Amino acid sequence: MNKLALYCRIGFEKEVAAEITDTAAERGVFGFARIQENAGYVIFECYQPGEADRLAREIPFTQLIFARQLVVVSDLLQNLPTTDRITPILQKYQEVSPHLKLQQSSELWVETADTNEAKELSAFCRKFTVPLRQALKKQGWLNFKQIKDSGMTLHCLFVRSDACYAGYSYNRNHSPYFMGIPRLKFPTEAPSRSTLKLEEAILTFIPREEESKRLNENMIGVDLGACPGGWTYQLVKRGLFVYAVDHGKMAASLHETGRIEHCSEDGFKFQPPKRKKADWLVCDMVEQPGRIVALIGKWLSNEWCHETIFNLKLPMKKRYTEVRRCLQKLADELTQSGLKFRMQAKHLYHDREEITVHVRTWRH
């Protein structure tokens, strides 16, 4: 098993390929990406044995922008007999078991890519999971009961009913969600579906145990381009008082909470009220990414807030290059301002032609 499978949104295979190629090269690992347009995944094949496993351990999954999941995989197992698909899969795992501690595996995910064609396999995958899990357990695998983060998950990525990649991921360095997709339910009281973007961002960027410390009723938030209030809703739900900045109308349900002040202003010109620095800034404005980065840089450099989640709308071409350029520009500005910071960006499931960025700053 010397390949990586990286799941993604369809149409972003080239960005995933460019990112994993660059990230691997930074660690002295070289290979080539196999891209199939609109496949919903990319296969990165390493030149040297053992390097896919090394990348799966060493590349911080949280620093990959466009990948939803990171899995070490076998060659594609093709022409699996319909009467016995399990034996060839078991054989692949048995080949690597001498130098891989499969006894530390805790879960099995039989998955497909997130495409309409692949989803037709989802019913098959659910049914196949049970007998495959039983067969793997008979080998002494999938019984790991210790701290989940220290084990591994076994994956079978089916591309057809008779073809799959068998592999594994490290629990401490992967997406904890099946297919790399968090299943969020749209709250009926939210003003717009965009609310799911911020909910997923909070889930992705802020550890669950820290959420109540980092987002609570003692804090002030600013939402630039707030109308009708999908993102404001997520902050208000967590107790923040929010300055909702937009010329458009906010949902009446948010006014009724008493936790917002609607500022009918241009988001690019708004500044926080004097002596009331915001704790949080959120922004989901449809604007060129360069302008948004300059705006966020101004807020953070002036210390008008110390934590932010914002979206960057991507151009039609050279999306990966533009993302790298924008994030580097923001990082340079924060460094020149003498701020320490942590920055993370992700192409979330609820994002489309955009990525979501989280930045937290401090002085010491």
Curated annotation (Swiss-Prot):
<dbReference type="InterPro" id="IPR040739">
    <property type="entry name" value="RlmM_FDX"/>
</dbReference>
<dbReference type="GO" id="GO:0006364">
    <property type="term" value="P:rRNA processing"/>
</dbReference>
<feature type="binding site">
    <location>
        <position position="194"/>
    </location>
    <ligand>
        <name>S-adenosyl-L-methionine</name>
    </ligand>
</feature>
<dbReference type="GO" id="GO:0008757">
    <property type="term" value="F:S-adenosylmethionine-dependent methyltransferase activity"/>
</dbReference>
<comment type="function">
    <text>Catalyzes the 2'-O-methylation at nucleotide C2498 in 23S rRNA.</text>
</comment>
<dbReference type="GO" id="GO:0005737">
    <property type="term" value="C:cytoplasm"/>
</dbReference>
<keyword id="KW-0489">Methyltransferase</keyword>
<dbReference type="GO" id="GO:0032259">
    <property type="term" value="P:methylation"/>
</dbReference>
<keyword id="KW-0963">Cytoplasm</keyword>
<keyword id="KW-0698">rRNA processing</keyword>
<feature type="binding site">
    <location>
        <position position="246"/>
    </location>
    <ligand>
        <name>S-adenosyl-L-methionine</name>
    </ligand>
</feature>
<feature type="active site" description="Proton acceptor">
    <location>
        <position position="313"/>
    </location>
</feature>
<feature type="binding site">
    <location>
        <begin position="227"/>
        <end position="230"/>
    </location>
    <ligand>
        <name>S-adenosyl-L-methionine</name>
    </ligand>
</feature>
<feature type="binding site">
    <location>
        <position position="284"/>
    </location>
    <ligand>
        <name>S-adenosyl-L-methionine</name>
    </ligand>
</feature>
<dbReference type="InterPro" id="IPR048646">
    <property type="entry name" value="RlmM_THUMP-like"/>
</dbReference>
<dbReference type="Pfam" id="PF21239">
    <property type="entry name" value="RLMM_N"/>
</dbReference>
<keyword id="KW-0949">S-adenosyl-L-methionine</keyword>
<dbReference type="Pfam" id="PF18125">
    <property type="entry name" value="RlmM_FDX"/>
</dbReference>
<dbReference type="InterPro" id="IPR011224">
    <property type="entry name" value="rRNA_MeTrfase_M"/>
</dbReference>
<protein>
    <recommendedName>
        <fullName>Ribosomal RNA large subunit methyltransferase M</fullName>
        <ecNumber>2.1.1.186</ecNumber>
    </recommendedName>
</protein>
<dbReference type="Pfam" id="PF01728">
    <property type="entry name" value="FtsJ"/>
</dbReference>
<comment type="similarity">
    <text>Belongs to the class I-like SAM-binding methyltransferase superfamily. RNA methyltransferase RlmE family. RlmM subfamily.</text>
</comment>
<feature type="binding site">
    <location>
        <position position="266"/>
    </location>
    <ligand>
        <name>S-adenosyl-L-methionine</name>
    </ligand>
</feature>
<keyword id="KW-0808">Transferase</keyword>
<comment type="subunit">
    <text>Monomer.</text>
</comment>
<dbReference type="InterPro" id="IPR029063">
    <property type="entry name" value="SAM-dependent_MTases_sf"/>
</dbReference>
<dbReference type="InterPro" id="IPR002877">
    <property type="entry name" value="RNA_MeTrfase_FtsJ_dom"/>
</dbReference>
